[in-house]
């Protein structure tokens, strides 16, 4: 029997972002929880980034953000999570036909590379065209900017409903002015630009995720589990 396989994408960007000079990159909790959930539901999981590189968002590594089983999986060198992470592939090394689910994780690093990550977009569009699922969380839906539905040659999210990290959350984090000064976009703008309907959570930290056919999106790290479960359910719907 062919194993069920999911592909989790990471942002390749790891550079200064915050006002204190700290670097942004991958939000570790998002991928810890999604990886664990996929594994517990019988999926083999691989990681990919546009360049094959990645780095952690330095604001979200403290113990206050990582605890319990997440902390154990992150700190244990031979955990399934770290073994998979050590095998991370560049996007052009991936065969899209090997996977049923493409899961775009985030972190503010995604603001920099996802909208122009053509190879990741190509993988996602092929998985979707083959009847698979595209899921994205937090800033992950920025990957949809320029992502084309192979069958229609239109934006893949056109006419669909998506969610993702809201501007209200950027304001609460004190980074909205950074986005403006560096001309970085938001999930809501990407939705509007590509003909999708953006659905905002009541509060930016709510566990909120939605499904529209084979397209699944979630708002933040608190939505990692529900978004992953929705992606699995969408595959079999």
Curated annotation (Swiss-Prot):
InterPro entries referenced in this protein's UniProt entry, alphabetically: Class_I_gatase-like (IPR029062), Prot/Nucl_acid_deglycase (IPR050325)
GO cellular component: cytoplasm; cytoplasmic stress granule; P-body
UniProt keyword list: Cytoplasm, Lyase, Stress response
Induction notes from the record: Induced during entry into stationary phase.
Single Gene Ontology BP annotation: chaperone-mediated protein folding
Recorded phenotype for the gene knockout or disruption: Results in higher sensitivity to oxidative stress, reduced thermotolerance, accumulation of higher levels of reactive oxygen species, and reduced chronological life span.
GO terms of molecular function: glyoxalase III activity; protein folding chaperone
The keyword Cytoplasm belongs to this UniProt entry's keyword annotation: yes
Enzyme Commission identifier(s): 4.2.1.130
Location of the active site: 138, 139, 170
Subcellular location: Cytoplasm, P-body
Reactions mediated catalytically: methylglyoxal + H2O = (R)-lactate + H(+)
Similarity comment: Belongs to the peptidase C56 family. HSP31-like subfamily.
Quaternary structure and interacting proteins, as annotated: Homodimer.
Function, as annotated: Catalyzes the conversion of methylglyoxal (MG) to D-lactate in a single glutathione (GSH)-independent step. May play a role in detoxifying endogenously produced glyoxals. Involved in protection against reactive oxygen species (ROS). Important for viability in stationary phase. May negatively regulate TORC1 in response to nutrient limitation.
Listed name of the protein: Probable glutathione-independent glyoxalase HSP32
Source organism phylogeny: Eukaryota, Fungi, Dikarya, Ascomycota, Saccharomycotina
């Amino acid at each position: 029997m062919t194993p069920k396989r999911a592909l989790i994408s990471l942002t390749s960007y790891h550079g200064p972002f915050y006002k204190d000079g700290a670097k942004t990159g991958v939000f570790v909790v998002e991928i810890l929880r999604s990886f664990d959930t996929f594994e517990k539901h019988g999926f083999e999981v691989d990681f990919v980034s546009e360049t094959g590189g990645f780095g952690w968002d330095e604001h979200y590594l403290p113990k206050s953000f990582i605890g319990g089983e997440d902390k154990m999986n992150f700190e244990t060198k031979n955990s399934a999570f770290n073994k998979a992470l050590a095998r991370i592939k560049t996007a052009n090394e991936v065969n899209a036909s090997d996977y049923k689910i493409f899961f775009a994780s985030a972190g503010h690093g995604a603001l920099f590379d996802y909208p122009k990550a053509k190879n990741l977009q190509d993988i996602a569009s092929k998985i979707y065209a083959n009847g698979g699922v595209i899921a994205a969380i937090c800033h992950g839906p920025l990957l949809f900017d320029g992502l084309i539905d192979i069958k229609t040659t239109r934006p893949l999210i056109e006419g669909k409903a998506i969610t993702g990290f809201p501007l209200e959350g950027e304001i609460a984090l004190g980074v909205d002015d950074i986005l403006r000064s560096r001309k970085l976009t938001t999930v809501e703008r990407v939705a509007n630009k590509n003909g999708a309907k953006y659905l905002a959570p009541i509060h930016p930290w709510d566990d909120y995720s939605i499904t529209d056919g084979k397209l699944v999106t979630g708002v933040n790290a608190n939505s990692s589990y529900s978004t992953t479960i929705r992606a699995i359910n969408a595959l079999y719907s």
